[in-house]
Amino acid sequence: RQFSIMAVVWGVVGMLVGVIIASQLAWPELNFGIPWLTYGRLRPLHTNAVIFAFGGCALFATSYYVVQRTCHTVLFMPKLAAFTFWGWQLVILAAAISLPLGFTQGKEYAELEWPIDILIAVVWVSYAIVFFGTVGTRKIKHIYVANWFYGAFIIAVALLHIVNSAAIPAGMMKSY
């Protein structure tokens, strides 16, 4: 339920940032000369908010709901599931602060700096443990196809994140 609510919140925030940067294309002075409100700083924030904050929360919410219903059981390790919620919100908050400040790797859809990437990895591994643990403790024999797709998505995103976000740290908030 928490992920569903935050999906709506982050969706609205992401779309509002999109409206701001779209308006800046017509009226560049809308950044008011403030560096962290420029198009170049807000565009990565918009894409990350819509994809990872809105989309990520929606996928967490639906996968957690579906796996419980189709496996006829509660989530495996509920406290770890709660950690995935708060950890993911922390990732989003860290991105919302660091991107406008210009802390970025400059890689499309992998802009976040290495400390945030590590937090993403920890949250994602926790998510995999909760999801696959729930499938493993199911009360029915077969696994619904939706769970195969969610499982594939979890593995694919993990691989994509590891490969696309691989970086060499050059400082606390800088990597190459």
Residue ranges and their predicted role:
Residues T134-H142:
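Inter-helical turn/loop segments and adjacent helix faces that build the functional surface
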